[in-house]
């Protein structure tokens, strides 16, 4: 059905839709588990995280996007997390993204005392033809910002990747969700 506003309006709508599209790719939640601080360094080939947290929620996610390729033209790519919706003022603490079993070229902005990923490597697709990534979420905070406790009160966790320093300015991925039910199951399995 032709637009009653003509081809110019249709072209403008297509341009605006493209501008709103995620430029860092689309990511899909895969799973979440509760891990001790010591379990973080080995699978990611970078220096151990020395942040003072005893445990993390390790969020597994995947994409068709190769973050090493995207990182070639960007200053930094960071994971962002919050209680859903993503603009919740809580500001959940998250480290990443990291490639599963592989180091990323990206240098995410890291808190003091936390090491960034090591040297770049060629990322390989998993058995499903996707790139596998992780982010490490601090499951509870009682000071230094609004408090939250995903161990005692699991909630849906919204995540997104943000980039800076690219030709297009600030860029982002889609928002993907680690459901409260998956977090609850991870906490129960990690508590055994």
Language model feature labels by segment:
Residues 11-12, 73-77, 123, 137, ...:
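Secretory-pathway extracellular proteins and peptide precursors enriched for disulfide-bonded cysteines
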Residues 16-19:
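C-terminal motif of bacterial Sec signal peptides marking the signal peptidase cleavage site
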Residues 1-9:
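Bacterial N-terminal signal peptides that target proteins for export
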Residues 39-106:
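Short, surface-exposed binding/anchoring microloops in extracellular/periplasmic proteins
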Residues 21-23:
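Bacterial signal peptide processing site
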Residues 25-50, 119-123:
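Short amphipathic beta-strand and strand-loop transition segments with alternating hydrophobic
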Residues 83-144:
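Extended, solvent-exposed segments with strong compositional bias
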Residues 26-34, 127-192:
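Surface-exposed edge beta-strand/loop patches
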């Amino acid at each position: 059905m032709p637009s009653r506003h003509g081809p110019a309006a249709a072209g403008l709508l297509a341009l605006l839709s493209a501008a709103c599209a995620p430029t860092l790719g689309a990511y899909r939640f895969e799973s979440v588990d509760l891990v001790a601080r010591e379990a973080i360094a080995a699978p990611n080939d970078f220096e151990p995280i020395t942040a003072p947290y005893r445990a993390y929620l390790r969020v597994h996610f995947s994409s068709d996007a190769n973050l090493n390729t995207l990182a070639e033209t960007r200053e930094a790519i960071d994971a962002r997390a919050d209680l859903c919706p993503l603009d919740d003022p809580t500001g959940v603490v998250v480290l990443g993204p990291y490639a599963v079993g592989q180091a990323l070229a990206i240098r995410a902005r890291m808190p003091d005392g936390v090491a960034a990923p090591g040297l770049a490597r060629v990322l390989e697709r998993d058995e499903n033809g996707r790139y596998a990534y992780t982010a490490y979420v601090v499951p509870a905070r009682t000071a230094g910002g609004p408090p939250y406790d995903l161990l005692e009160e699991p909630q849906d966790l919204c995540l997104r990747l943000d980039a800076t320093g690219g030709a297009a300015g600030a860029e982002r991925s889609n928002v993907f969700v680690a459901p409260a039910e998956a977090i609850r199951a991870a906490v129960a399995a990690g508590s055994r």
